[in-house]
């Protein structure tokens, strides 16, 4: 995704080099549906609760937060927002400063959009993560955002080199069974999603049982059906997951990303939430998985959370962009 997104003529969306205290370490938590919630300050106020979403190319404010801050919404300066199932035009708002640790955005016109769920104030997208390193410690419920080369590497991690597409959309090689895949690292997606090309490469049955059909609702409220299948031996960053429930479909964002023709897996929080720690290093172009409990042996997961919050992203004028986060309306896949 583009870090700039779709902006008004003459505007720029780039992280400033203003340096806040380097040792930013704040409480975070995977909430009850598995999302990573972090404290963010807006125009010096807060902190407010933002969803950390590496699948969103822009930082987004909810109408509730905009009203609370007394900001002026522009319905003339709109942007096109793309989600997992479709696109929608949304208004924007001018924000002087957003900060979270060593991430600072200044003088930005940002999208304003509702989330499917009313418990977050906004979305911290990747528009400020250039040359930054994000550490999520799931054991101690901490998140750290610092400059990429200012920290010592974690011990006992498995690393994978990544590449960027459309800005800072992070992709790493992986495998599902014997099929090589593009693995998109997306902390904003509760479910792991697969495209049609991966479905066919795995030779999965054409029609899933009715109970396995999942209705996916994106931020635009457009709906698409996906088929839920259990797949074996998913390997990302040299970490193997033995059994994974994946929702497959011709989802809108795969085509926007130009990943609809190649087997692609969106790695959601149902997988990453099982780690001890996750490091996403945009400066070094790598992802790190820390798995003390799971070291050198397969892990078995079942995606049991029903995703209900979707965070929008907005496309760049010259490059497609989308956010894979989705809401699945079928019952939970396992009792929790």
Pin down the residues of each PLM region:
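Pepsin/retropepsin-fold aspartyl endopeptidases
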Residues: 2-336
